[in-house]
Structure formats: structure tokens, C-alpha cells
From Swiss-Prot:
GO terms for cellular component: endoplasmic reticulum; plasma membrane. PROSITE patterns: SAM_MT_ERG6_SMT. Substrate analogs 25-azalanosterol and 24(R,S),25-epiminolanosterol act as inhibitors. The keyword Chloroplast does not apply. It comes from the Eukaryota. Sterol 24-C-methyltransferase; part of the third module of ergosterol biosynthesis pathway that includes the late steps of the pathway. The third module or late pathway involves the ergosterol synthesis itself through consecutive reactions that mainly occur in the endoplasmic reticulum (ER) membrane. Firstly, the squalene synthase ERG9 catalyzes the condensation of 2 farnesyl pyrophosphate moieties to form squalene, which is the precursor of all steroids. It comes from Candida albicans (strain SC5314 / ATCC MYA-2876). This is Sterol 24-C-methyltransferase. Keywords: Lipid biosynthesis, Lipid metabolism, Methyltransferase, S-adenosyl-L-methionine, Steroid biosynthesis, Steroid metabolism, Sterol biosynthesis, Sterol metabolism, Transferase. The keyword Cell wall biogenesis/degradation does not apply. Induction: Expression is induced in the presence of fluconazole and up-regulated in azole-resistant strain. Expression is positively regulated by the transcription regulator HAP43. Expression is also induced by N-acetyl-D-glucosamine. Expression is repressed during spider biofilm formation. Belongs to the class I-like SAM-binding methyltransferase superfamily. Erg6/SMT family. The gene is ERG6. PANTHER family: HYPOTHETICAL LOC100005854, ZGC:194242. Its EC number is 2.1.1.41.
Length: 376
């Protein structure tokens, strides 16, 4: 594979497109936000995303997606952010689950666990790489009282993150910056710690984003990441395995899924020292991490859990898809909205299957450190 070409930094273009597409919809939530979009701009976003996904899994197809990583991810989150918040909440990640623990509680605990493993505290300035709409950052700053800067290449998500920070009176602790995590604009050695929660999977090359994180970390600084990877059981030459990986890629805006070994080696190659690593999806939990997608209502703990899991279950996703299709047909939802829900359905099916076969994990946890002194 030839070297990946870094994206052009055209933040003014992105901002103008965001305003044209989303307008004031960042103040709304769920399907009401979807209805408020510009129909023409949404069609452009859908076309820009789905042009990469026609079933092609050749090296040439893959290389095109890798080289367009920035716009691919930008268009993806322009299309799916409202669906994510409607179905899942404001923390766009999976978690481990225990009996007696509600869905929201498990989400917070998963975030707390990362902060605990990293030893984050109130004296730290921390970078959240790929911060989404700020759900994890809000929880972690409440838990540790640290200052967090969120990095995101999607202007709409930044608008929503700022909206929530002000709403919950956390804007003195939280700030958000537009940027490409493959070419960060921060000064070198400007953060005490960096974390990424299921975000660096969008990088075309893991070594690229990890090297940028290494650069902005102070010597002795810690980096913690929940990484999406294919496990050691995954076989790239196995047609069924590759189909599962492709389904995850197309439905989640990922240029290419990499293996655990690739992620680990990438961390080492840029200079990190691995202090802790564990696949938290492979610990024989009674309740699987993918249960909200598989629709196993028996694991729900609260009434709110039943609502969440129903929305994210196969039946709930079917209802959402058909409802959105009807809204699109009568002109309420932008053209391409139903295609987006179909892609999310493909992702859900393959995430569950990848989890059941232990081919995929969304929570390969690495806690690594930048050495105090450079190695010769």
C-alpha cells in the first residue's frame, strides 16, 4: 500500500458546509434535528460518503477510502450524529455491563475506568482525541476535575459539544478544537495526558495518529485508548471474516479495520512504552458488550434500558429505518436518510456477529507512556 496522503486543511469550507447543512439544528435532538437539516446539503453529504461503499474490497478501493479519510469521516458524522444520540445517547461507545447496573451507569463506569487506569487528576490538562459531542469528556471532568480539550474534525459535533458544556455549566473545564488528528495544530509537549475512546479507528494509519499524540504529550505523559481492532482470531483471507470487517467499516465510517497486532506495534513504533493492555471484551462477562444491539431485553436493568435497547435492537432499528424512509418520501427528512439507517443496520449486524465470534473488539485497552527521555 502506498503512503496515505494527509488531508487538505480547509476548515473554512467545512464550517460553511456545516452551517448550510445543519443550521441551528444543533439545539435540537434526535429526529427533530434530522428534520431541521438542509435537504440539498444532506444529499451532498450522503453522496460524498456512499461513493466509497459499493461493495469494493480490493486494494484500490481500500486505498481510495484511506486517502479520503478526513472527508469520509466528516461526512459520516454529519449523517449519523443525530441517529447516534437518538438511539444511544451522547457517549458514542460500547461498555461492559453487569447485573444490577443500568445502561447509563455502565457507560459512565467505562469512562471512569479509563480515567482511573490513566491516573487523571485535577492538575492535568488532557486532550480528548475524537471527542464526539463531548459525552465522555463531561463525565471524566466531573470524575477527575481535570481540564479537557476535545479535538474533532466535525464542526456539527463541536457545536453540540459546546452546547452541552454550557448547558451543564462545564464550559470552564471543557473546550473544543477543530482539527485533523493525523496533523494536529497543538504545540509539542502541551498536554499532561491524552485519551481516545473508540475514535482513532477512523485513522487511515494508526501509526500516524499515535505519532501525533506522542508529539503533543509532555515527556512522562500518559495515553489511554479504547481501540477498535480485529482480534487474533480474525483471518483477512477468510471471506466470511472479511465480510464482517467490511460491514463494520461501511456502517461506521472506518477506512480500514486493523488488527490488534498492528495497533500494538504502531504504539511501540512511535516510542510509547506499554504499561497496561487488555481486551475488555474477552473477559467472559455474563452480559456481552453487544447486548444492546442484539436486543437481549433480559439483560435490561431499568425502564430506561428497555427503551434504549428496544431502539437499538433489530426490531427498533427496522421501525426507525421505515419511519425515516417515510419521512424522506414525504419530504420531511433529507434524501439519503434511509440509506444511512441501512448502513447503521449493517454495522449493527456485523458488530454483533464479530463480537459473538470474537473476531472484533471495541475495547482493546492500552495505557501507554511517553518516556521522560528520548531513547537513542
Amino acid at each position: 500500500m502506498s503512503p496515505v496522503q494527509l488531508a487538505e486543511k480547509n476548515y473554512e469550507r467545512d464550517e460553511q458546509f456545516t452551517k448550510a447543512l445543519h443550521g441551528e439544528s444543533y439545539k435540537k435532538t434526535g429526529l427533530s434535528a434530522l428534520i431541521a437539516k438542509s435537504k440539498d446539503a444532506a444529499s451532498v453529504a450522503a453522496e460524498g460518503y456512499f461513493k466509497h461503499w459499493d461493495g469494493g474490497i480490493s486494494k484500490d478501493d481500500e486505498e481510495k477510502r484511506l486517502n479520503d479519510y478526513s472527508q469520509l469521516t466528516h461526512h459520516y458524522y454529519n449523517l449519523v450524529t443525530d441517529f447516534y444520540e437518538y438511539g444511544w445517547g451522547s457517549s458514542f461507545h460500547f461498555s461492559r455491563y453487569y447485573k444490577g447496573e443500568a445502561f447509563r451507569q455502565a457507560t459512565a463506569r467505562h469512562e471512569h475506568f479509563l480515567a482511573h487506569k490513566m491516573n487523571l487528576n485535577e492538575n492535568m490538562k488532557v486532550l480528548d482525541v475524537g471527542c464526539g459531542v463531548g459525552g465522555p469528556g463531561r463525565e471524566i471532568t466531573r470524575f477527575t476535575d481535570c481540564e479537557i480539550v476535545g479535538l474533532n474534525n466535525n464542526d456539527y459535533q463541536i457545536e453540540r459539544a459546546n452546547h452541552y458544556a454550557k448547558k451543564y455549566h462545564l464550559d470552564h473545564k471543557l473546550s473544543y478544537v477543530k482539527g485533523d488528528f493525523m496533523q494536529m495544530d497543538f504545540e509539542p509537549e502541551s498536554f499532561d495526558a491524552v485519551y481516545a475512546i473508540e475514535a482513532t479507528v477512523h485513522a487511515p494509519v494508526l501509526e500516524g495518529v499515535y505519532s501525533e499524540i506522542y508529539k503533543v504529550l509532555k515527556p512522562g505523559g500518559v495515553f489511554g485508548v479504547y481501540e477498535w481492532v480485529m482480534t487474533d482470531k480474525y483471518d483477512e483471507t477468510n471471506e466470511e471474516h472479511r465480510k464482517i470487517a467490511y460491514g463494520i467499516e461501511v456502517g461506521d465510517g472506518i477506512p480500514k479495520m486493523y488488527s490488534r497486532k498492528v495497533a500494538e506495534q504502531a504504539l511501540k513504533n512511535v516510542g510509547f512504552e506499554i504499561e497496561y493492555q487488555k481486551d475488555l471484551a474477552d473477559v467472559d462477562d455474563e452480559i456481552p458488550w453487544y447486548y444492546p444491539l442484539s436486543g437481549d431485553l433480559k439483560f435490561c436493568q431499568t425502564f430506561g434500558d428497555y427503551l434504549t435497547v428496544f431502539r437499538t435492537s433489530r426490531i427498533g432499528r427496522f421501525i426507525t429505518t421505515e419511519s425515516v424512509g417515510l419521512m424522506e418520501k414525504i419530504g420531511l427528512a433529507p434524501k439519503g436518510s434511509k440509506q444511512v439507517t441501512h448502513a447503521l443496520e449493517d454495522a449493527a449486524v456485523n458488530l454483533v456477529e464479530g463480537g459473538r465470534q470474537k473476531l472484533f473488539t471495541p475495547m482493546m485497552l492500552y495505557v501507554v507512556r511517553k518516556p521522560l527521555e528520548k531513547k537513542d
